[in-house]
Amino acid sequence: MTKPIRNVAVLGATGSIGAAALDVLARHPRQFHVSLLAAGQRVDALLALCHTYRPDHAVIGDATLYTTLRDGLNAAGLATKAYAGEAALAELVASTTCDTVVAAIVGAAGLHSTLAAARAGKRLLLANKESLVLAGMLLMREASISGAEIIPIDSEHNAIFQCLRSRTTNGVHRVTLTASGGPFRGHNRTMLAKITPTQAMAHPTWSMGPKISVDSATLMNKGLEVIEAHHLFGLPSEQIDVLVHPQSLVHSLVEFIDGSTLAQLSLPDMRTTLAVGLAWPERIGSGVPGLDLMKHNRLDFEHPDTETFSCLRLARDAMQTGGTAPAVLNAANEIAVSAFLQGRIGFLTIPALIEHALTTLPRYEADTLETLLTVDTETRRITHAALTHFPLPL
């Protein structure tokens, strides 16, 4: 019996994860139809993707670019319907337009559409880690009510998901997330003070966008992933470990109470995890070759240096504090990373700004979306204001 084609929405289509998702989808035209493409501001790139994939709908986040998108689609003779803005995207994601959503919008901007997909009971391939960090309790609650199927796309959480064959953690003693260590593994603080945005974006093993590359360099990416694992798998902090693994071949390990440990290994390529999410529980080709252990015959592990790279420690502290503290962490980090990429602050000012926000703002219960968004806005305001009080980059 032929299975029905799955209609897939790719949110953040012009980014690195969006490109990887579309690559996998294009390999399986009889199984998947790209029904919706969404991007933030890169309207020309979105138009090019629409020409290639012929989606039913296209959404540009920046409403001022709506006319450009609409006219570009008409000029190309495409039947794709144009939309703009966060509300339009959330409405489309919740509609019958799609049954599968690749949530790859970077930052808190992806929260509304991710929540909309969860509320509508979609299969949600979650690559937007900020949604879990900012509103993890709300997101998981909505998914539980609607029956939405959340499959994490981060390589570490996807590895845990594969080892467990679900998000059920019966019999789990602990999980270990691996980190490449970023491009500055082994650097001291004196060396880090001179790091430039270009250097920070040169990740040794993964191909990623600017923001996540900087997060990897500061180890904030791993801190956010610890919080993600807490929400996705219902594990407390003491059952979530982190090890630096520079080869990026072992993506996570799951240790069970009987002494067994399962690990997932693959080449560092997001197409693998996206293929898992799209076809689960079946397997489909991703375009990624298998792992040749004779070629990659060395696996190294070490503890992370949380004194030099304090973002990982700050993330754990925020998770332990709970409530709105992770939302503060996330918003302050987004502002700090943006300022660093613009050359307005130095690399070491990123954790300093985050710590400033965490110590300045009070903790509230994270029980409503309105509370979280208010805290997010206030955190961005005080972090913006604090930029002038920190030294300029060397």
From Swiss-Prot:
Gene3D superfamilies the UniProt entry points to: 1.10.1740.10, NAD(P)-binding Rossmann-like Domain
HAMAP family named in the record: DXP_reductoisom
Organism, as annotated: Xylella fastidiosa (strain M12)
Keyword Manganese: yes
SUPFAM superfamilies: 1-deoxy-D-xylulose-5-phosphate reductoisomerase, C-terminal domain (SSF69055), Glyceraldehyde-3-phosphate dehydrogenase-like, C-terminal domain (SSF55347), NAD(P)-binding Rossmann-fold domains (SSF51735)
Family label: Belongs to the DXR family.
Top EC category: oxidoreductase
Alphabetized GO MF terms: 1-deoxy-D-xylulose-5-phosphate reductoisomerase activity; manganese ion binding; NADPH binding
Alphabetized UniProt keyword annotations: Isoprene biosynthesis, Manganese, Metal-binding, NADP, Oxidoreductase
GO biological process, one term: isopentenyl diphosphate biosynthetic process, methylerythritol 4-phosphate pathway involved in terpenoid biosynthetic process
Pathway: Isoprenoid biosynthesis; isopentenyl diphosphate biosynthesis via DXP pathway; isopentenyl diphosphate from 1-deoxy-D-xylulose 5-phosphate: step 1/6
Cofactor(s) needed for function: Mg(2+); Mn(2+)
Protein name as it appears in the record: 1-deoxy-D-xylulose 5-phosphate reductoisomerase
InterPro entries referenced in this protein's UniProt entry, alphabetically: DXP_reductoisomerase, DXP_reductoisomerase_C, DXP_reductoisomerase_N, DXPR_C, DXPR_C_sf, NAD(P)-bd_dom_sf
Catalytic activity: 2-C-methyl-D-erythritol 4-phosphate + NADP(+) = 1-deoxy-D-xylulose 5-phosphate + NADPH + H(+)
Binding site for NADPH: T14, G15, S16, I17, G40, N128, E130, G209
Known function: Catalyzes the NADPH-dependent rearrangement and reduction of 1-deoxy-D-xylulose-5-phosphate (DXP) to 2-C-methyl-D-erythritol 4-phosphate (MEP).
EC numbers on record: 1.1.1.267
Residues at which 1-deoxy-D-xylulose 5-phosphate binds: K129, S155, E156, S180, H203, S216, N221, K222, E225
Residue positions binding Mn(2+): D154, E156, E225
